[in-house]
Amino acid sequence: MRVLGRTGLKVSSFGVGGYHAAVPKEEAESIALVHRALELGVTFFDNADCYQNGVAEERMGKALEGRRKKIILMTKVDQRDAAGSLKTLERSLRRLRTDYLDIWQFHGIRSLKDVDQIFAPGGALETAEKARKEGNIRFIGVTGHADPQVHLAALKRYPFDTIQMPINVLDPHFKSFRKTVADEAVNRNAGVIAMKTLSMGKILSYRVATVAEALPWVWSQPVSVLVSGCESVEQINYNVYLAKTFTPMPEDEQATLLARTEPHKGTQVEDYKRSPES
């Protein structure tokens, strides 16, 4: 278990990504996947209002029913205004079958305009702070994967409890969140949530690294929890196995791995880092 920054929450080092958990065609498969994660001791569950047009939240809500107090539940909102974000929050609570969220994050900030909209009068931050006072959410976070400078700008404007970003074996070579944001987040006591840990599977399909190399490298960075998309019970089993057998990767091994991955840097594999204009 690791501590999620200033929240003080103790979380499993591996977290289930909500988007991929809802990929299986049959709902029963998604529920079985979540139940298996629970059996193995996973306590952190990621989601977003927009994932699979709401199906991801609905399936996770069914799977976690009766187990809510044993886990840390996070979801995200894309709307930047107060009114729209309030409707989204209410919808997420209904789908997830809960009356509160442990963490609610502003989803996918890509530009300073996004940040300005969230903080503007009538912006989504107003909804988040009101919901926190009323007990509908416990902590406020922010996510994004396009530009580390936007993450830094958000951190400097508000004491976010959590911040979610791409951290993987390619990230240090190009528009790096690990080098630019992660340490600053830790200095500000924000819980760091790693995502895109396999670059949406492209680290595997491009043969950049194996899962057994890629995930331990991420856990060796200053992260509280690694979120990875799993679409089968077998993938859950293997990822949790890696989490439970993890030992910090020596610096020389990290350097060797990064030297090997460097030729793959850029947006061909990390395509989510393309600028908003491209």
List where the protein language model places each region.
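Conserved, mostly hydrophobic/aromatic
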Residues: L4, V16, F45, M60, ...
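Active-site mouth loops of central-metabolism enzymes
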Residues: G17-A28, M74-G84, V115-Q117, I203-A209
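N-terminal binding-site loop/beta-alpha segment at the start of enzyme catalytic domains
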Residues: M1-I71
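Glycine/proline-rich, positively charged
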Residues: R80-V169, H173-F177, V186-I193, E234
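Active-site beta-loop-alpha junctions enriched in small/polar residues
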Residues: Y19-A21, A48-C50, K76-R80, F106-I109, ...
